[in-house]
């Protein structure tokens, strides 16, 4: 059962890291610490999945996805999945995820009954935030017209940084923007998500 659930999740997101698989299987499926390696090995042996590298410095992808390397993995989704696995409390919340390449969204999901959209942004892509703000405001107008009081979505803006200066620059830009939509700023302290990076989160209601 655990193998099937994991395989379906990898199929949905296209790739996962070893750290993500370990966290998913232990936190949401109740596996002990040594079980994930066995499950990964078994699925690789069955050719259901494959690793981009022999060691744990690679990603796990579906066996039918064609040869992939670390370089052509969509890391936007990888970052968003780290966030979701940390924040989710139930398996259903994890399995609510939907990858997307529409509207600059990497991954959407439902947490505690609220709809989230996670977007990876670099410092030279801050225009994405304004596009999302406009879409949120339009969705609010539609909801008002339909007498629906539900918040359309909560944005998670993800960044990868190497230095404290980069983090300060991001926060300065947000302060100047004075963004008036529900959002979180999630700053990962790494630009290589192959192993789980530390991150800082700033939430604005």
Where are these regions (language model features)?
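Exposed, interaction-prone assembly regions rather than primary DNA-binding/catalytic cores
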Residues: 76-165
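Generic detector of well-ordered alpha-helical segments enriched in charged/polar residues
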Residues: 7, 37, 82, 168-172
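Extended tandem-repeat scaffolds
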Residues: 1-2, 7, 11-12, 21, ...
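Nuclease-adjacent, charged terminal/linker segments that flank catalytic cores
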Residues: 1-69
